[in-house]
Amino acid sequence: MRIPKWTPATWSVVAGCIGGVLGIVIVGIASPIRIISPTDNGVVTRFGKYHRTLEPGLHYLIPFVEWVYKVPVTKVQKEEFGFRTSKSSEQSHYVNNISHESLMLTGDLNIVDVEWVVQYRIVDPRAWVFNVESQERRQTIRDISKAVVNSLIGDRAILDIMGPERSAIQMRAKDMMNVLLKRIGLGVLVSSVQLQNVVPPQEVQQAFEDVNIAIQDMNRLINEGKESYNREIPKARGDADKLIQEAMGYANERVNRAKGDVARFDSIYAEYVKAPHVTKTRLYLEGLGAILEKTENVLLIDKKLENLLTLKDISKVSKKVVAGTREE
């Protein structure tokens, strides 16, 4: 058998084939090695079907059979509504003219401009990859957030939204979004909903500020009235209690005095029943004695005497006579 003689061209073809085979082998050995960063998880598919989830680290995949999708599970992501912030070099630009997202109707039929931020994190990498199309995940979160916030704003008055109900709306929106996102199986958890800015539209902002000033004045007057009430009412109550106590004391005194008079009358009457003449004489003498004690001069005159000039009046008459003589 004759062995053919290889030419240099033949040798170059053989060398190229060997190099190609070696290249395929090297690529097949090196390409299945994947590094999962500390902030990610890897979702591995085998023939397009979910197979396993990889933790951070170095992992080997079967070439041309297994593929990995890296999912940022530790990164807190956010969606902005009613405004956008974009970073250009070292500065952040703020755009807040997205009225189709921020203008809402309140429960008392007012229009309010609401800007808010939703922060969320991926907690189920498998659900995140398979349950919703990649181009629809972000829009799904935005649609749910807008529906929830619109519902909560529409149930409340504008002053409540801007004041005491603001924190309650944030907490309620977070809870409602988590319920809906869990129901559709998106694999994310909302960590916070923050109402950044809640104001009336610019066209009516001046009128609304006037209303706020009037409300503040009303509250101030109410507080002043309450302060005056708290100051005057206790004083009036004290004066009233004092008058009541004085009246009760006077009433008790009169009642006790009346009871004493009744007891005295009863005792006198009992004596009178026993000896009417003696009792009558005694009462007469006691009454006469009480009267005479208050009189300086006492004159006893017999009622049968006529043209009687008492010695007491002689001194007065003599003084008048002497005075008349001197005048003459």
From Swiss-Prot:
Main location class: membrane
Membrane-spanning ranges: 13-33
Highest taxon of the lineage: Bacteria
Location within or outside the cell: Membrane
Disulphide bonds in the chain: none
Family classification: Belongs to the band 7/mec-2 family. HflK subfamily.
Protein purpose: HflC and HflK could encode or regulate a protease.
Protein name listed in UniProt: Protein HflK
Gene name as annotated: hflK
